[in-house]
């Protein structure tokens, strides 16, 4: 009988220990909300419209999941996939896609051998407190125009 009571108490103690350690493993993190993505996209679209450009804007969260995709009227369909690639590349490498494009331009083409990479200017990581919480990608114009519109989206984060 004492052995059964001991086993029961030991089992309960282990259950409590595992339950408390499991809950301690959850972390809180900031991520890109739909409202934030819409604010960024609106600023990016305004920048494109001001310059008579047509663009696609993609915003992804910290897992590379699509939060927002917007395609301005008249923008070529191919820009959808390019904008997604730029956003995911900026997220995965935690830097603007222009940095990867520059690496290739400097004669180091090994970057293009990496899987799932779009090494073309126009993708920017979204930073909060020094951590990447998502990314924005734009496509439809020249690479510089794409980045200008993506940057306008990032700048909207600092506006109240």
State where each predicted segment sits.
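Positively charged n-region of N-terminal signal peptides that target proteins for export
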Residues: 1-5
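Bacterial N-terminal signal peptides
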Residues: 7-19
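Flexible, solvent-exposed loop/hinge segments and secondary-structure transition points
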Residues: 22-160
